[in-house]
Amino acid sequence: MTVLEAEDLSFGYGDRPVLDGVSLAVEPGAFLGLVGPNGSGKTTLLELLIGLRRPDSGTVRLFGSPAHERADGERVGYVAQDTAGTGDAMPVTVAEAVRMGRYPRRLRGRFDAADRRAVEDAIERVGIADLAERRVGRLSGGQRQRVLIARALAAEADLLALDEPTVGVDAESRSAFYDLLGSLNEEGLTVVLVEHDLGVVTAHAGEIACLNRRLYFHGDPETFVETDALAEAYGTDHRVVSHGH
């Protein structure tokens, strides 16, 4: 089953059109990078794809159901931009925050050994086991984003949607963060990433969708850098700086 499918999708804020006739599909196990200039509609498209907004026209299906119905919302892990104060809004420890990912599965029952193992495994997989008892508010931006990924893993999410998750994160932590995403994707997790850094996307994503109100390209990174889609979408001689290892 296709994870995400958008057909002839259009959306605007009042009289200002943001997306026009966007169609794309995301298959299980894909790593899709959404790129485009500032104000191109990347974040809006991501929010539409996972059902946080409803389109003005067109359709979006998430795991086969209308995305806005959120019928499979527990299968989606969403990591938004980390902003000042995010940690203060979560006055809990890392382990407690990750444990929240199990709540939808325990509305009618108590946490058991399987839940505890799922939380511990998720924390271990994202490399923050040594921070399990630390308050989220005391973490760095990159560490907080790992907590959100761990929460999605604890929830056994099938799709991880991220909106520029490393804004304000130092270069070394950024590199480690994207290596983590690559590893999780190799394990079978579907990833959709909004990112302004074209070099990061071409180095890590298996597919690229380039948009600026409309979709200019959807395909593999190698083909993307050889087409005119970059210049057409950005309206300038934009260069891709590789961040490969």
Residue ranges and their predicted role:
Residues 206-221:
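H-loop (His-switch) and adjacent beta-strand-loop-beta switch element
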Residues 195-196:
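H-loop/switch region of ABC-family ATPase nucleotide-binding domains
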Residues 50:
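Helix-to-loop junction immediately C-terminal to a conserved catalytic motif
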Residues 160-164:
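Catalytic Walker B motif of ABC-type/P-loop ATPase nucleotide-binding domains
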Residues 95, 99, 113-131:
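Conserved ABC ATPase "signature" region
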Residues 58-74:
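Conserved ABC transporter NBD signature motif
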Residues 4, 18-19:
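Conserved structural motif at the start of ABC-family nucleotide-binding domains
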Residues 152-153:
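ABC ATPase C-loop
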